[in-house]
Every structure is written in C-alpha cells, then in structure tokens.
Regions:
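Short, basic, glycine/proline-bearing loop/turn elements
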Residues: 1-5, 48-54, 127-135
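Active-site metal-binding loops of divalent metal-dependent hydrolases
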Residues: 2-5, 33-36, 83-85, 135-137, ...
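Core catalytic region of metal-dependent phosphoesterases/phosphodiesterases
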Residues: 6-114
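Polar, enzyme-active/binding microenvironments
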Residues: 9, 23, 223-241
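A generic local structural motif
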Residues: 15-18, 65-66, 118-124, 144-148
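Acidic carboxylate-rich catalytic motifs and surrounding loops in phosphoryl-/glycosyl-chemistry enzymes
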Residues: 78-84, 119-122, 223-227
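Short acidic low-complexity segments
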Residues: 109-129
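Conserved beta-sheet core of the metallophosphoesterase superfamily
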Residues: 129-227, 231
C-alpha cells in the first residue's frame, strides 16, 4: 500500500484498494509509510492557523479505520516508519519530558497491536532478499524506480518503497555469464488526492498506484497497478471503479 497521507487520501482510490484487499485476502499487507499526514504538527504548520486546528484525533481515527479495512483479511500486516509519521517524535523533541511516555510512542499512539499490525522502525525484510522501506533513507531520484534501486544497491537486496509518490520499477544485474543476480527497486506510487496537496501548487510528477507481489518461495513477481485519476484500476483480472 502506497502513501495515503490521511486525511489527504484519494477517497475513491482508497475504497477501491480496500475492495481489492477484501476480495483477494492477501497473505500479507505491506504499508510503505506515510499512512497519516500529521499536517497539524508538521514544521510547515508552525506559526500558521493549521497548527491550531484540532483535527489530530479525527485524523488518527480515520487512519485506524482505513488501515483496519485494508488489513483485516490478511494473515499479517506490516508498516515501516516514514518521515510523516516521524512528525510525532519530532514534536515530542520540543517537550523532551514527554518522550518516554509509552502511549506517545507512534505504534502505541496508533494502537497497531490491537489491529494486528507490526510496526518497524527500520527496513523490514519481508521475504528473503526483499526489503520494505519508506524511501527517504537515501537520495531521491526524479525518475520512477531509481530511488528504490539506489537503496537496493546499497542494501544488496531488492527494495519496495514509497515516499517519492512515483510508480515505477527498475532493475540492476551483476555477474558474469550464467552466474549473475538481479535486484529490483520498486516504488509503489501514492494514494493521495492531488487536489489536496496544496504544497505542490498543482504540479507534481506523481502517479497513483499500488503493487501486488507474488512470492513462490524462491522468486518474486511484482505486478504494478496504476490507478487512474478517478480512483479506478484493474488488478488480477477485475476492474474496481
């Protein structure tokens, strides 16, 4: 699942991805981070009316509801840290006396344990040789797939990430003759409503999408699923409109 940044998510696209998750009952649901925007506690809101909007509780409840709908039919669910969810910790840094309160640790703040979601503070290797990351751990590249591939080269393993809001796959092969290996960098797009992303001023090289991964116990086959601007898409032979 790509960056939602709730409550700035694309409602139709989100509902359709939930329909897909309920229909397919995936073994695992992986969320690349930025599931909640935390816009009222961002550094960009400081000194603006946004910082005084009392929406944090409602945003959290909506995020919990959407994550539950996305993951309730899966055997397991995982989320990795991200720059937007780090905003809670960054806010606590301004009041260090609150930092050790367990209820203000992000995974407890979101009550992931009750939902059966496992939160990872760093890379998560979800299958052998395949890592889930957010995508902000290295330098970003304007070309879809290359931010993930650069992370993959550093990690020595294939990487699935978000952060760039781009949908793309790139690969790198090394070796001699028949003795070679290929690693992949996959960026999963985003599920944001671009109209609500006012900071882009309406112009952004973003693509909505998700990725479905098939693992046969040895090899991974990625299926890139582009999502249209109206929130519709086709996946695994079925259209969601």
């Amino acid at each position: 699942v790509s960056d939602l940044q709730i409550p700035l998510n694309h409602e139709v696209a989100t509902k359709n991805v939930i329909k897909l998750a309920r229909r397919e009952k995936f073994d695992s649901v992986l969320v690349v981070g930025d599931e909640i925007d935390f816009q009222t506690i961002s550094k960009w809101s400081e000194g603006t009316p946004l910082a005084y909007e009392q929406t944090l509780h409602a945003d959290r409840e909506l995020t919990q509801s959407i994550l539950w709908d996305l993951t309730e039919n899966a055997r397991e669910a995982h989320i990795v840290r991200s720059n937007h969810t780090d905003r809670l910790y960054n806010t606590l840094l301004k009041v260090p006396g609150l930092m050790n309160l367990p209820e203000l640790q992000y995974e407890k703040f979101m009550d992931f344990a009750t939902m059966g979601i496992q939160f990872h503070k760093t890379f998560y290797e979800f299958e052998k040789g395949w890592i889930l990351a957010h995508g902000d751990e290295g330098n970003t590249n304007p070309n879809p797939g290359l931010t993930a591939l650069n992370l993959a080269k550093k990690a020595g393993k294939s990487v699935v990430c978000g952060h760039t809001h781009k949908l793309g796959l790139s690969a790198y092969t090394e070796g001699v003759g028949a003795n070679y290996r290929t690693i992949y960098g996959i960026e999963v797009g985003n599920l944001m409503d671009k109209k609500q992303a006012s900071y882009t001023k309406g112009i952004a090289n973003w693509q909505m999408g998700i990725v479905i991964l098939d693992w046969d116990g040895k090899n991974m086959t990625p299926h890139m699923i582009p999502i249209n601007k109206d929130g519709s898409f086709t996946a695994l032979g079925k259209s969601y409109v």
